[in-house]
From Swiss-Prot:
Entry superkingdom: Eukaryota
Reaction it catalyzes: an N-(acyl)-sphingosylphosphocholine = an N-(acyl)-sphingosyl-1,3-cyclic phosphate + choline; N-hexanoyl-sphing-4-enine-1-phosphocholine = N-(hexanoyl)-sphing-4-enine-1,3-cyclic phosphate + choline; N-(dodecanoyl)-sphing-4-enine-1-phosphocholine = N-dodecanoyl-sphing-4-enine-1,3-cyclic phosphate + choline; a 1-acyl-sn-glycero-3-phosphocholine = a 1-acyl-sn-glycero-2,3-cyclic phosphate + choline
Signal sequence range: 1
Keyword Metal-binding: yes
Lineage: Eukaryota, Metazoa, Ecdysozoa, Arthropoda, Chelicerata
Residues linked to a glycan: N286
EC number(s) on file: 4.6.1.-
Listed GO biological process terms: killing of cells of another organism; lipid catabolic process
Needed co-factor(s): Mg(2+)
Name listed for the protein in its UniProt record: Dermonecrotic toxin LarSicTox-alphaIB2bi
Gene3D superfamilies: Phosphatidylinositol (PI) phosphodiesterase
Cysteine disulfide partners in this protein: C78-C84, C80-C223
Locations listed in the record: Secreted
Entry function: Dermonecrotic toxins cleave the phosphodiester linkage between the phosphate and headgroup of certain phospholipids (sphingolipid and lysolipid substrates), forming an alcohol (often choline) and a cyclic phosphate. This toxin acts on sphingomyelin (SM) with high activity and on lysophosphatidylcholine (LPC) and ceramide phosphoethanolamine (CPE) with low activity. In vivo, shows potent insecticidal activities. On mammals, induces dermonecrosis, hemolysis, increased vascular permeability, edema, inflammatory response, and platelet aggregation.
Length: 309
């Protein structure tokens, strides 16, 4: 080597790996949040709400007199500043939902990972609950899960308003088993949405043989100021979730459209917020007080896994 030549310095860069490890650690320490678009009952609203920031939607399901799921329809009254009468035939909605949650489809939304079916079983007799669950399972199996052949991938929550209708869960579960697809129950969770006493809800799950995959809702229509209802029951649900012997895995609060109420809900540690304005919730998630503690849930987040305060 001539004296005039110099060796080029060699640098070892570890930053990408360190950065990835840091990202994983930070992600693990942040509570995953489901922004739940409320009352998504027309096919076109799937795109609308996801584009506004929702990673989850809630859809109303009405039943006919024979306990067949018939329409995605809410009807009047509903939340203030919303049109209550948008609807679709249930099976047609399921097909649109399948396209929106199947990778590779032209209508696919990677962000849409959870669907809450608000089951309007109030029109049914208590002894029809099992049949409603059975027929709901058959419809989902055919039109959403595509009979187990590359169907929609979203997680599903069956939200039931009446504790007396716990046999809907039994009918749903037993039908998937009979039809040869018990593995799909891994994608299914539960919610009793009637704002009942937490202990009474626990008893209904016991009757239904449910020991996991539980979301607990709490809330009131946006037509009533949130401070009138308050967050007392939601706090009890969070306390149950965080206890060593609680039955709740996730807690969501509804219907939240205001920035102040969103912050209050995040402050007590909810996992999901149902809203008519997903962009409001997304904006709060990005505020400096919250972006270090919370993040938008993705498909990699198990919605049946408990994240305690």
């Amino acid at each position: 080597v001539r004296a005039t030549e110099k060796f080029a310095p060699i640098y070892f860069f570890c930053h990408p790996l360190q950065s990835a490890e840091t990202d994983v650690a930070e992600r693990a320490n942040k509570r995953p949040i489901w922004i739940m678009g409320h009352m998504v009952n027309a096919n076109y609203q799937i795109d609308e709400f996801v584009n506004l920031g929702a990673n989850s939607i809630e859809t109303d399901v009405s039943f006919d007199s024979s306990a067949n799921p018939e329409y995605t329809y809410h009807g009047v009254p509903c939340d203030c500043r919303r049109w209550c009468k948008k609807w679709e035939y249930f099976n047609n909605f399921l097909k649109a939902l399948r396209k929106a949650t199947t990778p590779g489809d032209s209508k696919y939304h990677e962000k849409l990972v959870l669907v809450v079916f608000d089951l309007k079983t109030g029109s049914l007799y208590d002894n029809q609950a099992y049949d409603a669950g059975k027929k709901l399972a058959k419809n989902l199996l055919q039109h959403y899960w595509n009979n187990g052949n590359n169907g929609g991938r979203a997680y599903i929550v069956l939200s039931i308003p009446n504790l007396a209708h716990y046999k809907l869960i039994t009918g749903f579960k037993e039908t998937l088993k009979t039809e040869g697809h018990p593995e799909l129950m891994e994608k299914v969770g539960y919610d009793f949405s009637g704002n009942d006493n937490i202990d009474q809800v626990a008893n209904a799950y016991k009757k239904a043989g449910v020991t996991g995959h539980v979301w607990q809702s709490d809330g009131i229509t946006n037509c009533v100021a949130s401070f009138i209802r308050g967050l007392d029951r939601a706090k009890k649900a969070v306390k149950n979730r965080d206890s060593s012997n609680g039955y709740i895995n996730k807690v969501y609060y509804w219907t939240v459209d205001k920035y102040a109420t969103t912050r209050e809900a995040f402050d007590i540690g909810v996992d999901g917020i149902m809203t008519n304005y997903p962009d409001v919730i997304a904006n709060v998630l990005n505020e400096s007080a919250y972006k270090g503690k919370f993040r938008l849930a993705t498909y990699d987040d198990n919605p049946w896994e408990t994240f305690k305060n």
